[in-house]
């Protein structure tokens, strides 16, 4: 009898260990290509004559992930505490980094904007290109008229947002 109980317990333990444990841990995020295409197509419909539209893909402690579509060149920017990682998805643009902000203005969340950048290095960017923007370095994406540029943006050490999530 003792052998039977031991075997039964071993069998139940094996079944329990073999149970489906495919639950992702808290904080895990996966945005597959089909989802990114769906969101990207929707953003293209929303863009119209706007400068930028985006969708927040995930928000985590200290960083967030966005899918961004730029339709026009925005003001140059500078983040006092955040760094950015950008991965090109669709279209082409020119990325300018370094130099000095022209007419800088302080913004909330420890950021600054300027009308342009004086100096700076220019790089053509497109799908698959990865850009790392260090903390406290001016940068801007130059967008050609009627040629939007889409990219995944990971904001690292992001200052808390006060606006409602999209």
Predicted regions and their residues:
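A short, N-terminal "cap"/entry segment at the start of jelly-roll beta-barrel domains
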Residues: 17-78, 164-166
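A short hydrophobic beta-strand segment most commonly corresponding to one strand
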Residues: 146-164
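Conserved short histidine dyad/triad with adjacent acidic residue
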Residues: 62-84, 89-92, 96-102
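Bacterial N-terminal signal peptides
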Residues: 6-15
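Positively charged n-region of N-terminal signal peptides that target proteins for export
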Residues: 1-4
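Conserved metal-binding segment of the jelly-roll/cupin
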Residues: 124-145
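A generic "binding-loop/recognition-motif" signal
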Residues: 71, 81, 137-138, 147
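A short beta-strand-loop-beta hairpin characteristic of the jelly-roll/cupin
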Residues: 92-127
């Amino acid at each position: 009898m003792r052998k039977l109980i031991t075997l039964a317990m071993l069998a139940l333990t094996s079944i329990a260990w073999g149970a489906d444990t495919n639950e992702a841990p808290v904080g895990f995020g996966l945005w597959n290509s089909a989802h990114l295409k769906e969101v990207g197509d929707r953003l293209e419909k929303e863009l119209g004559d706007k400068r930028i539209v985006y969708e927040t893909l995930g928000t985590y402690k200290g960083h967030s992930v966005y899918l961004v579509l730029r339709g026009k060149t925005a003001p140059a920017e500078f983040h006092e505490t955040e760094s950015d990682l950008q991965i090109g998805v669709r279209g082409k643009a020119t990325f300018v980094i370094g130099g000095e902000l022209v007419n800088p203005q302080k913004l909330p969340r420890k950021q600054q904007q300027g009308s342009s950048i004086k100096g700076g290095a220019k790089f053509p960017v497109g799908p698959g290109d990865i850009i790392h923007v260090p903390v406290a370095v001016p940068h801007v994406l130059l967008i050609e008229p009627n040629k939007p540029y889409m990219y995944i943006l990971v904001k690292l050490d992001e200052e808390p947002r006060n606006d409602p999530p999209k």
